[in-house]
Amino acid sequence: MRCPYCGHLEDRVVDSRETQDGQATRRRRACLSCERRFTTYERIEDVLPQVVKKDGRREAFDRAKIVEGVATACQKRPVSTEQVEALVSAVERQVQELGEREIRTTVIGEAVMQRLRTLDEVAYVRFASVYRAFRDVGEFMTELAGLARKDGEER
């Protein structure tokens, strides 16, 4: 493993453990040259389906895009990086379990919103406002009213 600080190619593993979701191994490493420590994550690379965009284009499933979208929705909210990673891992597992060769962005977006709604309602509304591309304030208010109604039923 190349040291991110000095570029040296040799290090030693100081600590290894599974991540909370059990989908990756977290390793603390120490560079044998500069002695600085850094963390790496190892995860099994699964074959994920092609994503069919709204305009019909196809592209490879990109976990980083989902992480970025969820993290943006969660900015300045009490949601940790670990919670974002766990949410994205759950969506990724759901996509894998479908066993399809292709999946529409709408399926991925709805899976993200379903989980985000239980994690943080403000982040959910932020994500939904971009994902659903509301045409006007009325559509946005309808979504908020639906959220408030569902929230009232759960209490």
Curated annotation (Swiss-Prot):
A zinc finger (unnamed) spans 3-34. Residues 49-139 form the ATP-cone domain. GO terms for molecular function: ATP binding; DNA binding; zinc ion binding. GO terms for biological process: negative regulation of DNA-templated transcription. Signal peptide: none annotated. It holds the Pfam family Zn_ribbon_NrdR. Binds 1 zinc ion. Keywords: ATP-binding, DNA-binding, Metal-binding, Nucleotide-binding, Repressor, Transcription, Transcription regulation, Zinc, Zinc-finger. Its cofactor is Zn(2+). InterPro entries: ATP-cone_dom, NrdR-like_N, RNR_NrdR-like. It comes from the Bacteria. Belongs to the NrdR family. Negatively regulates transcription of bacterial ribonucleotide reductase nrd genes and operons by binding to NrdR-boxes. This is Transcriptional repressor NrdR. It comes from Anaeromyxobacter sp. (strain K).
